[in-house]
Regions:
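Active-site neighborhoods and metal-handling regions in enzymes and metal-associated proteins
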Residues: 1-593
Length: 593
């Protein structure tokens, strides 16, 4: 394999010489800026042999490097050995950025190539500005891997299916009407939608082209008077074709998007995440308005049907979680279970629920020190057995036809240290404080993020990830525009939005703690000072009481905790057998000092 990588890099260098390029940048992205990448666009993996989910390869005529984050330092070091590719560890003070490195190894007036189809317009613009400061030019080059990658996987061609109105709550025609109103407000004559979850939401269609995300590879062009779906046509059954015709949606081949955009005249609304090649094509004869996609906001506010679906999906997911937790507490003493095996068992419990449609992201099952790796993914090389001691951090989720779930529980498997209990309780305090928040209209997630962090800040502890994100409805588990983050996120929090609440503490080499619910923003009250909102928990699953130091909790926090557990029991117990019901009754019994 190592010799193959060396040969692949050599073939890329020949391509670069042919196109007068001194360097080529290969990211871990696709034309639609997706979180998960279809195999057709896994060029970074092919050229380097590095199989991690995040990383960027840069190849010059005599050097090569891979930039990746701390999750993959060990894996990358092993996989890159003897390939001629140097590992650059991101976010370490001694590690140069890609631009800094290129500034050192290239000469003035050299050309750096990228494939515009897999680099966003925004990222390309920023990269171009930074390189120009070093008198280096950025060039949109042809995709070299169409030529070099001889057994490249085809574009995904899985069948698309209709997401029924009983789940969607709003028809495709009504959604397009809303989008056209937004286009007019932006003084535009059309919009190109490239984010796959936005296309799926607009058309009330779903697919299976992307791991964990029920979406399909496509573009959607909506103008004042027409709508055109760009897609590989054999993905469409006769039923879906008839559905599109009924909704006045034209169908064009996926490969014709560039030509059609070059012919488009008018003013086109594009998101900054549009890929650079599409942006360049649209600029041929059109005026361009770069602005957030209106679909992002429309999709984020769930309608009543979607909210009802979320409640049903969360109940089913809660039943699966209770069955799993009860099984796990007993199974851990056998010594036969590992991080990977318990993930498979959780999948079985979820798959037994109606309307299950796969997981919503790759499960994070981190035992003891592995829990401190924020985005840990157990693989055979890292998998470890569970013992009746310490804690297991389990972050998981599922796709159901009527909702998407995302939940984290830190599970006590046996004896804990005082430090572990303290950290667990600090996280719980932050989690409860944000859960209890009431806030006025006009509030954004940044203003509330600190509520979850304050208990930890008082102890001199912090976490570096965001506290929460939006959740799609049988769509992507991570969606915007709203988030809880320390850096400013201007999107306002309004009723109908779903959002996660997931503070954590991570101590390298020791343990990790995170507790997460998905919540719904709902009206709270009207006062002389305005309209106020609050959070309603959607997730229904017990929170482990065994690690809680009750003296650290306020009376108000204990009251919230007990009320939440009462809700969990009341909602789930009718769906359980007698043994499961008794177990749930015990683990949700009132917390006392």
């Amino acid at each position: 394999m190592k010799s193959e990588i060396i040969n692949r890099i050599a073939s890329l260098r020949n391509f670069m010489r042919k196109h007068k390029l001194s360097a080529f940048i290969i990211p871990s992205t696709d034309p639609h800026s997706g979180e998960y990448i279809p195999k057709h666009w896994e060029a970074r993996k092919w050229i380097s042999g590095f199989t991690g989910s995040a990383g960027t390869v840069v190849v010059t005529l005599d050097k090569a490097g891979l930039w990746t984050d701390s999750r993959y330092f060990l894996q990358a070091a092993e996989q890159l050995e003897n390939t001629g590719i140097t590992l650059f560890k991101e976010r370490l003070p001694e590690t140069p950025s890609i631009v800094e490195w290129l500034g050192c190894v290239l000469n003035a007036e050299d050309n750096v190539g990228i494939d515009g189809w897999v680099n966003s317009y925004q990222e390309t613009s920023n990269l171009q500005k930074e390189l120009e400061k070093k008198q280096i030019h950025l060039t949109l080059a042809p995709d070299p891997f169409n030529e070099l990658w001889t057994d490249r996987p085809a574009l995904p061609d899985n069948k698309v299916f209709i997401h029924e109105l009983k789940y969607a709550g709003l028809s495709c025609k009504d959604k397009i009407t809303q989008i056209r109103e937004a286009i007019r407000r932006n003084s535009c004559t059309g919009i190109l939608i490239s984010a796959l979850d936005e296309v799926a939401w607009t058309l009330n269609l779903r697919g299976s082209d992307v791991h964990c995300n029920p979406v399909f590879v496509s573009y959607l062009l909506i103008t004042e008077y027409s709508s055109t779906l760009y897609i590989i046509e054999n993905k469409l059954s006769d039923e879906v074709k008839d559905y599109l015709t009924e909704n006045e949606i034209k169908v064009r081949p996926y490969s014709t998007i560039e030509k059609d955009l070059k012919d488009f005249t008018g003013k086109l609304l594009l998101s900054a995440n549009i890929n650079a090649a599409v942006h360049a094509a649209a600029c041929a004869h059109s005026l361009i308005e770069i602005a957030p996609s209106p679909v992002l906001f429309l999709k984020a506010i769930k309608n009543e049907t979607e909210i009802e679906g979320f409640h049903r999906a969360m109940k089913r997911d809660g039943v699966a979680m209770v069955k799993f937790l009860r099984w796990l507490k007993a199974a851990v003493s056998t010594g036969n279970e590992t991080e990977i095996s318990i993930d498979k068992k959780l999948y079985e419990f979820r798959a037994g629920q109606p309307h299950f449609n796969g997981i919503s992201f790759d499960t994070i099952a981190g035992y003891k020190a592995h829990g401190a790796i924020v985005h840990y993914e157990a693989i055979p090389e890292t998998d470890i057995p569970l013992k009746p001691e310490g804690m297991l951090l389990l972050d998981s989720g599922a796709q159901y036809l009527d909702g998407t779930t995302d939940i984290t529980r830190t599970i006590v498997l046996g004896a804990l240290t005082k430090e572990e209990k303290t950290d667990y309780t600090l996280v719980l305090k932050g989690f409860i404080q944000l859960s209890m928040a009431q806030f006025p209209h006009g509030t954004c997630g940044t203003q509330l993020d600190a509520l979850a962090r304050l208990p930890m800040w008082k102890a001199g502890i912090n976490y570096l990830h965001g506290t929460g994100h939006g959740v799609g409805c049988f769509l992507n588990v991570h969606e915007g525009p709203h988030q809880f983050r320390m850096n400013h996120m201007p999107a306002l929090l309004v009723p109908g939005m779903t959002v996660t609440n997931e503070p954590g503490i991570y101590k390298t080499g020791r343990h990790g703690v995170r507790t997460e619910n998905t919540m719904l923003i709902v009206p709270s009250q009207e006062t002389e000072f305005g309209t106020y909102y609050k959070f309603e928990p959607l997730t229904l699953c017990p929170i482990d009481k065994e690690a809680i130091l009750t003296d650290m909790l306020s009376d108000e926090e204990i009251t919230w905790f007990n009320q939440y557990h009462e809700k969990v029991y009341n909602c789930l117990n009718p769906e359980l057998n007698n043994e499961e019901r008794e177990w749930l009754k015990e683990v949700t019994s009132p917390l006392k000092r």
